[in-house]
Amino acid sequence: LDKVFFGAWIELEDEEGEILRYRIVGEDEIDLPHGYISVDAPLARGLIGKFVDDEVTVRLPKGETTYFIAKVQYERPHWDKRPTPEFS
C-alpha cells in the first residue's frame, strides 16, 4: 500500500530536506520520542488518505508546514527503535 492509513509508518521530507519519521497510532500508543503520533493529531489528520509522492500542507500549532510523503509502509521498518511489548 502506498496510501496513508491508521497504523502506517511514514517517512516525510520537510521544506528544508530533513527526513522525519512517524507512525500513526491510537491515543493509548502515543510515544512522541519514538515518533508515534495520535491519529487525532493535526499532522496525522493531514496525512491520512494521502499517497506516496504527495505534497501535503498541514496546519500545525507552529503554523503551516509542507511535507513530501517519501514512503509509507505497514511492516515495522528498521528505523523504528521502539521496544516491542512483551505479552505473557
What are the residue ranges of the model-derived segments?
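Short, solvent-exposed secondary-structure boundary/capping segments
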Residues: 32-36, 76-87
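Non-DNA-binding regulatory cores of transcription-related proteins
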Residues: 1-67, 73
